[in-house]
Amino acid sequence: MSPTDDWRIGEVIKSATEKQVGFKWNFFVAFGTYVLITIALTVIQELTVGTGDSVAAALVELLVSLIMLPLGIGLGLLGIRRAAGKATPVSTLWEPYSDAIPIIVMFIMMTVLIVAGFFLLVLPGIYLAIAYSFAPYLIIEKKMGAWEALETSRKAITQYWWRYFGLMLLATLLFIVGSIPILIGLVWILPILGIATGEVFTKTFGADDGESLELEVD
């Protein structure tokens, strides 16, 4: 696999805008599921150990974060699959749990490295936070180990770090704009941003060996 940097911000946004048609329903069912589970776990935590400074509360909060980590990655996986022209059933949300152990190991390693980068000069931490963006998806889609995924993501994104950072800034701006009219714009913006990230991933690493499907339209 030879990562490539052959993509442009305008192109991925345009392609994502086209591909969000027929994708929004599954995306928001998955997103709603994520939100409901988050709320449920938060309520359970509050009713059992609370959210104070106790050791028990800290341990439960860490456990909840680790439980939710694969689920959040599943949301991003929907965008990657859509960008690659593959089926995006709501069940995609649960797929990262089959790789939960390497994902958690990767997350711990990534956190240590990013925090160390921030302690050094801040800028290395920012660089790594962006450069490691694709690591969890390389574990799922390319069956890499934790360290291999981190290094592959870092080396690939380094080729176009500023361009990808620009895409993230644009995504933030679009999110803010979409939030202004009582959040209605996010119905389109969130799926577009998810697919746009998936477009970059797919253009960089290629699609996996799964069967490509014709994109459905509303």
Put a short name on every predicted segment:
Residues 3-4, 53-87, 111-151, 179-211:
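Selective recognition of hydrophobic, aromatic-rich stretches within alpha-helical transmembrane segments
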Residues 4-37, 87-116, 128-179, 217-218:
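Interfacial aromatic "cap" segments that immediately flank transmembrane helices
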Residues 34, 42, 46, 76-78:
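Hydrophobic alpha-helical segments of integral membrane proteins
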Residues 38-51, 178-179:
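Juxtamembrane "helix exit" motif at the C-terminal ends of alpha-helical transmembrane segments
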Residues 45-46, 58-62, 101-102, 116-122, ...:
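Short, functional N-terminal and low-complexity linear motifs
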